[in-house]
Amino acid sequence: MANPPHGGVLKDLLARDAPRHDELEMEAEKLPAIVLTERQLCDLELIMNGGFSPLEGFMNQKDYDSVCENVRLADGNLFSMPITLDVSQAVIDEGKLKPGSRVTLRDFRDDRNLAILTIDDIYRPDKAKEAKLVFGGDEEHPAIKYLYNKVQEFYVGGKIEAINKLNHYDYVALRYTPAELRVHFDKLGWNRVVAFQTRNPMHRAHRELTVRAARARQANVLIHPVVGLTKPGDIDHFTRVRAYQALLPRYPNGMAVLGLLGLAMRMGGPREAIWHAIIRKNHGATHFIVGRDHAGPGKNSKGQEFYGPYDAQHAVEKYREELGIEVVEFQQVTYLPDTDEYKPKDEVPPGVKTLDISGTELRNRLRTGAPIPEWFSYPEVVKILRESSPPRHTQGFTIFLTGYMNSGKDAIARALQVTLNQQGGRSVSLLLGDTVRHELSSELGFSREDRHTNIQRIAFVAGELTRAGAAVIASPIAPYEESRNAARDAVTQAGGNFFLVHVATPLEYCEKTDKRGIYAKARRGEIKGFTGVDDPYETPSKADLTVDVSKQTVRSIVHEIILMLETEGFFDRS
């Protein structure tokens, strides 16, 4: 029999509200609407299907404060992660939202009405408190960056009436709701289920540790990977799911099933581990594996871990009785070549030879085409990963040139385009500052906001082209550090490679060699908001290459860029 849900009752709002579907659908058309973001959609789906039981909506201020401060809802139920609906003042004003009013929650992807929320309260969160208490306070933490840079200024709390499930077009048969997974376990006759959470591909070590956990508890295995939002830079879920499917036959017959979880991870370490355990309990699991640095985001810029390696295990152990799911703590397993087996590291006798491949080394082997041994991963899994991780010399990249007007950016860009075309092997696209302004951003001015929007557009185009294997050369002024960092993030998150080249030609030289007289017009006040005259240029703090046309020729600068690309493996050396 499956584990009882958290709070005692599975809050399957879709099943509960199905008899009123037509009535709610008609009402939703007449109400103001909040169009949900991707993260909000992930949260809503798990509220509606019971994955976040005992929640029945987005948290009001009482629950939010209690979760942040006490790791439990206002009614006393253990819950570790704030589940909130953030909105802007403009949305509140447009919808005339207030406590007691009803509002439709709508999918941004297809404009479908998903639910109606009855507003309990609208409140301004204490983001500093949330950042400190929930995530630890390090401003480099991805969830804290998201909180400060993406989350709107107000939260809307209230209960939900469900109308429609989210539409998915990928791996539909594997997207079990908690109720469906519980029925599936009953059909299979499974009474004890060990759930395994992952956002990465699985290899032999993962297979070994899950089988060990199941055998020790006379249980079966639920492979339950996250396919919602994970950490930027993670391998896409399409590739991962194909790899999980390829791995499944390697388990003893009938031992494991694969189900997908559309969760938006926060990378919240100890808090997230508790949350993950609650979610798996709601899906019917009786046991949950928590490993080293569970759901941690890695290291900050100083090379420091955001959380201790076993903080997550300590957190779930602290609340073990309340969680109502047995937590399986595991040590990292390692390969013993002399006996061709895997063992937990704490069980390996001193002096015995072991082998491991780190995630960084694996990515490097995929990038370079170096062999990946069978003791580490199965050939069918490696084949899938290689298909989605082509060698570096076939990948696209973006060269992002930034500097003052007339610093030589465009001359470098044109010369680099010719050189790369001569090199061959990939298409080359040129995004000159003036061309982009004319073709993509003609309606924009030169305010800080408009400049940022212009760079966002360049980054979007560059990311799409780079992902498709093209070489992109962009040469906007891009005076602001925030915009340049956002451009780097956009391209890398699209799966591309990004190089920032600071064309650090001094302002005096740019002005002296300005044959068009644009600087002179700016000095006379005929042009406002001109970079270097009455608007600042923020020197890049993390340029991949710094060049100067007042001291170097364009030819030598292009050669430096080519050498940088060659060193990084972007040209075929065979």
From Swiss-Prot:
Q: Where in the cell is it found?
A: Cytoplasm
Q: Where are the transmembrane segments?
A: none
Site features described as Transition state stabilizer, chain residue numbers? H203, H206
Q: What is its EC number?
A: 2.7.7.4
Chain spans, region N-terminal: 1-169
The pathway it acts in is: Sulfur metabolism; hydrogen sulfide biosynthesis; sulfite from sulfate: step 1/3
The residues annotated as the active site are: T198, R199, N200
What is stated about the way this protein's activity is regulated? Allosterically inhibited by 3'-phosphoadenosine 5'-phosphosulfate (PAPS).
For the ligand (3'-phosphoadenylyl sulfate), the binding residues are D434, T435, V436, R437, R451, I477, A478, R516
Q: Please list the reactions this protein catalyses.
A: sulfate + ATP + H(+) = adenosine 5'-phosphosulfate + diphosphate
**UniProt GO molecular function:** adenylylsulfate kinase activity; ATP binding; sulfate adenylyltransferase (ATP) activity
Task: Please indicate which residues carry the site annotation Induces change in substrate recognition on ATP binding.
Answer: F330
**Cellular-component GO terms for this entry:** cytoplasm
Positions of the UniProt region annotated as Allosteric regulation domain: 395-574
Pfam families in UniProt: APS_kinase, ATP-sulfurylase, PUA_2
> What are the UniProt keywords, alphabetically?
Allosteric enzyme, Amino-acid biosynthesis, ATP-binding, Cysteine biosynthesis, Cytoplasm, Methionine biosynthesis, Nucleotide-binding, Nucleotidyltransferase, Transferase
What does the UniProt record say this protein does?
A: Catalyzes the first intracellular reaction of sulfate assimilation, forming adenosine-5'-phosphosulfate (APS) from inorganic sulfate and ATP. Plays an important role in sulfate activation as a component of the biosynthesis pathway of sulfur-containing amino acids.
Assembly and oligomerization: Homohexamer. Dimer of trimers.
Q: Which family does it belong to?
A: In the N-terminal section; belongs to the sulfate adenylyltransferase family.
UniProt comment concerning the protein's domains: The adenylyl-sulfate kinase (APS kinase) is non-functional. It is involved in allosteric regulation by PAPS. PAPS binding induces a large rotational rearrangement of domains lowering the substrate affinity of the enzyme.
Protein known as? Sulfate adenylyltransferase
Organism equals Aspergillus fumigatus (strain ATCC MYA-4609 / CBS 101355 / FGSC A1100 / Af293)
UniProt lists the gene as met3
